[in-house]
Amino acid sequence: MTKERSRAAKRSEEELLDIKQAASLLNVSEASLRRWTDSGKLPCYRVGDQRARRFRREDLVAFVSVSQETASPAQGADRPDSVKNAAKTQVAGMDIAYHDHICAIYGRPAGRLKLSVPLLREGLKAGDICFLNATQPGKAHILKVLREVYPDVHKAIKDGQLIFPALKRNKAEMLDQLEEMFLKATYSGEQKLRLVGDMEWALSVDWSEQEVYEYELEYNNTLGHRFPIISLCQYDVRVFSSKGILDALKSHEDTYKYPLRDCCI
């Protein structure tokens, strides 16, 4: 009986998926799986001296099913990673590609608007799902000018085409929230997304500049290059230190595909 139990336990452990296999099955990042298991959203087992995560296939399938039901996916909707050749869009004279994660540096109030407003305006006109992360004053400034060039802003907000994610104090929770929003949009059939992050918002919820830098790097690795999204992060030199601005440039390598004169405002 002891040998049978031992063989059963070994067989059960062999049937578990490691984190790399689970990430491949769900088509998500390993970082996402860690966040979901840490938050209790996704069950996992811990095995060995290293307490490595292991997953049952049925738990992963059930987790995806719940996510899809929540998103009300369109029949035959593509998964996020399937859109690899998304078109470019012109913003302030630049042809910006989807999947690019770029930054803009500005030093005066009008600089906040130069790229953010046309990016959102053209996105709303094209039917893209758009996200705006900003402090309340920053959001009000951008929306005021956006309404002047796109009168249907209120309708876009009401219809869920223009979304304002909650500004989270914890960067893992912020990334998790964005990932869920992007998954919901893409599972429901949306092929193109846009995000504007006026990054003073992160300081307003007490992130350090180092946390902002780490967040940008993880966004790059787990979201920005994975989803069919144009991501624009804006930095005000009057708010961020010189090191904070340097880190912004280091964490947005896609920016160097474009003329810096258009990104440094």
UniProtKB/Swiss-Prot annotation:
- Which Pfam families does this entry report, sorted A to Z? HTH_17 (PF12728), MEDS (PF14417)
Q: Which UniProt keyword terms apply here?
A: DNA-binding, Repressor, Transcription, Transcription regulation
Question: Which Gene Ontology molecular function entries are recorded, alphabetically?
Answer: DNA binding
Per the record, DNA-binding region residues lie at 17-36
Q: Which InterPro entries match?
A: DNA-bd_dom_put_sf, HTH_17, MEDS_domain, SinI_DNA-bd
Determine if Phosphoprotein is one of this entry's keywords: no
Annotated function: Transcriptional repressor of the dcmA gene and of its own gene.
Subunit text:
Monomer.
Q: What is this protein called?
A: Transcriptional repressor DcmR
According to its UniProt entry, this protein's organism is Methylorubrum extorquens (strain DSM 6343 / CIP 106787 / DM4)
Question: Which gene is transcribed and translated to give this protein?
Answer: dcmR
